[in-house]
Amino acid sequence: MTVYHFVGIKGTGMSALAQVLHDMNYTVQGSDVEKRFFTQKALEERGIPILPFNKENIKPGYTVIAGNAFPETHEEIQAAHELGVPVIRYHRFLGEFLQKFTSIAVTGSHGKTSTTGLLAHVMQGVHPTSYLIGDGTGKGIEGSKYFVFEACEYRRHFLSYFPDYAIMTNIDFDHPDYFANIDDVFSAFQEMALQVKKGIIACGDDEYLQKIQAKVPVLFYGFGDDNDFQARNVVKTTEGTAFDVFVRNTFFASFEIPHFGDHNVLNALAVIALCHYEEMDVRIIQERLKTFQGVKRRFSEKVLGNQILIDDYAHHPREIIATIDAARQKYPGREIVAIFQPHTYTRTQTFLREFAESLQQADQVYLCDIFGSAREHHGKLSIHDLQAQIPNSRLIQEDNTSILKQHENAVLIFMGAGDIQKFQEAYERTVHS
């Protein structure tokens, strides 16, 4: 049997896929940069070897799974070609692998990871379910009927997938380094919809998803009256959220989730709709929804003295608003402090005004330098351009996080898709020192 070698194994999708294959008794190893990433822990716990990049890592008989960030000129990929070792890109491999299961893709501009995690958690209460989540978490169960996975629209990678079902959470303009505009994003989702084989669960409150055409049934969920699955009588507390679900205007059941904000109600509705479609027991759905702990880097909380620290992946204006809203629901009356690290120059440039507006939902804003992606290390603008748009905002460096101590009893939200965790870790050290 072949050895699967992952080039860039610390990537979130790559790490999760490596875990899935390992759990299903395939032989797995991988290589990456030396820098430590939060995705490593699960790999290390499974004993999956993580090697430094070196062309000597590639041996005859291997199969190379290559991360999308690595060009054909990468030394390991070149070595594979020279040895006649097959090289398969991550999304292509996953697309072929899915065919062994009843597959459920979770896609959308926002909410993919949380919804994938929630769906996997609920379905595991009913059926053996393998899953791949974009927070670097994966689990493979031999003999599982279902495979739940996160499908990313970036560079249209999700067009490698032909799933049985798809959940579509929303369509929004993001990834401006690739997509030209919202119509370009919509066209990608429309193409994806035509590849789904059994059914689509889509948010009917989203104006773009309402226009989706498909060859299979489309069930809509949301708060609006026109949806097939509608949330009504929403009750928000500091413990979570409760709501009733009506299916085509007929009461179905009541549900509780230990999460906050309208976006989490919508995520739960999507899961309820899919499980209902697959005729799963409503009592199990209710119980599983109550016990979901969330996914990595999505409203991850920690108590530090009198302060609450929240780590969140929010890197788009709409996500920032959702995260701040959730914090206000759980911690009413507390000062909300946003510490934000913009992710990529192109996104910051494109949404400069929207970032300023969304961040001003917080009581105080601190800004970190822009985090450039692997594909872009500098841009025409700097963090000062965003600061100029936000009255009373301040810049923060990794070595001066102690200024956050002045916000006693506050909720500090560290947001971003780069390495914003470094700032939280630095702050925790100043408090403990």
Swiss-Prot record:
Uppermost EC category: ligase
Keyword terms: ATP-binding, Cell cycle, Cell division, Cell shape, Cell wall biogenesis/degradation, Cytoplasm, Ligase, Nucleotide-binding, Peptidoglycan synthesis
Catalytic activity: UDP-N-acetyl-alpha-D-muramate + L-alanine + ATP = UDP-N-acetyl-alpha-D-muramoyl-L-alanine + ADP + phosphate + H(+)
Keyword Transcription regulation: no
Signal sequence residues: none
Highest taxon listed in the record's lineage: Bacteria
GO MF: ATP binding; UDP-N-acetylmuramate-L-alanine ligase activity
Pathway(s) annotated for this protein in UniProt: Cell wall biogenesis; peptidoglycan biosynthesis
Keyword Repressor: no
EC number of the protein: 6.3.2.8
GO annotation, biological process: cell division; cell wall organization; peptidoglycan biosynthetic process; regulation of cell shape
Residues holding ATP: G108, S109, H110, G111, K112, T113, S114
Compartment annotation: Cytoplasm
GO cellular component: cytoplasm
PANTHER family reported for this sequence: UDP-N-ACETYLMURAMATE--L-ALANINE LIGASE, UDP-N-ACETYLMURAMATE--L-ALANINE LIGASE-RELATED
Annotated function: Cell wall formation.
Family (UniProt): Belongs to the MurCDEF family.
Protein name: UDP-N-acetylmuramate--L-alanine ligase
